Amino acid sequence: MGVHILSTGSSVPNFSVENQQFEDIIETSDHWISTRTGIKKRHLAPSSTSLTKLAAEAANDALSKASINAEDIDLIILATSTPDDLFGSASQLQAEIGATSSTAFDITAACSGFIIALVTASQFIQAGSYNKVLVVGADTMSRWIDWSDRSSCILFGDGAGAVLIGESSINSILGFKLCTDGRLNSHLQLMNSPSDSQQFGLTTVPKGRYDSIRMNGKEVYKFAVFQVPIVIKNCLNDVNISIDEVDWFILHQANIRILEAIATRLSIPLSKMITNLENYGNTSAASIPLALDEAIKEKKIQPGQVVVLAGFGAGLTWGAIVLKWQ
């Protein structure tokens, strides 16, 4: 039983912040940011724009393109690390788009979340459990940024991307590999940092509260540049496809220096990498489906082409998927 990508969709907040605007709050410049990250601007969600709203807009975009009603969806998987509700926002997304017949749950894996969610969805279809599955990668990382931290506040943007997949005799997903190394988890974290507590005799019970995102940029860079080319090569070897046979690479949009270094290690031209960093920044779980949707809109990806998706992020987690575009 095959898995076919039926459509894609995306959404970003209307409000955006350009590099020059950071000069008013931290010691930086447009030149410093753009040369080190490849980012020119990023879209940020105001208080009136929820994670669920962005995810629903991307989902409805994908459903509209496939001419499929929300009631026909069997399963919704929302990849996010920034839900509106700590218990998860997939059920809120289900209600928002009217997918009343579907099961819905969240996957939390930061910037690798979409890759893991798409693999999970494909396995449900191949097992015969579900027919149509909506996968959404969405994050509002701006909610968790320390705006005085120059190393991280310039990187992140908010957004959502969606992919609708279904059962088919044609198989779009040729292979995948997923990896985790929890020993490296301290390099990228958003930790519970209690500021209050309740005392029960001699025992203190802390009250939950999360801190801002903390990242060791040098270690994340070394990790991504070393591990991502390996997982891509291994994934391609498993399906007997060479690097030269790949038409497009869509990697998590972390920063341009990571993408350039990975391209060098894979011995591929940077022109084979689809990037949208300049306009969106690092949108975490949304970055890959957002870039995929734009590439399809721009008619870069054509039927019959081989596309590699690869994500990497907190955990530390990473993975790759090989697609044959149909």
From Swiss-Prot:
Molecular functions (GO terms): 3-oxoacyl-[acyl-carrier-protein] synthase activity; beta-ketoacyl-acyl-carrier-protein synthase III activity
Pathway field: Lipid metabolism; fatty acid biosynthesis
Catalytic activity: malonyl-[ACP] + acetyl-CoA + H(+) = 3-oxobutanoyl-[ACP] + CO2 + CoA
Sorted UniProt keywords: Acyltransferase, Chloroplast, Fatty acid biosynthesis, Fatty acid metabolism, Lipid biosynthesis, Lipid metabolism, Multifunctional enzyme, Plastid, Transferase
Active site: residue positions: C111, H252, N282
GO biological process, one term: fatty acid biosynthetic process
Subcellular location as annotated: Plastid, Chloroplast
InterPro entries named in the record: ACP_syn_III_C, ACP_syn_III_N, FabH, Thiolase-like
EC number: 2.3.1.180
Entry-linked Pfam families: ACP_syn_III, ACP_syn_III_C
ACP-binding, as annotated region: 253-257
One GO CC term, this protein: chloroplast
NCBIfam families according to UniProt: fabH, PRK09352.1
Subunit structure and binding partners: Homodimer.
Entry-linked HAMAP family: FabH
Family of the protein in this entry: Belongs to the thiolase-like superfamily. FabH family.
Function: Catalyzes the condensation reaction of fatty acid synthesis by the addition to an acyl acceptor of two carbons from malonyl-ACP. Catalyzes the first condensation reaction which initiates fatty acid synthesis and may therefore play a role in governing the total rate of fatty acid production. Possesses both acetoacetyl-ACP synthase and acetyl transacylase activities. Its substrate specificity determines the biosynthesis of branched-chain and/or straight-chain of fatty acids.
Free-text domain note: The last Arg residue of the ACP-binding site is essential for the weak association between ACP/AcpP and FabH.
Name this protein carries in UniProt: Beta-ketoacyl-[acyl-carrier-protein] synthase III
Source organism of this protein record: Porphyra purpurea
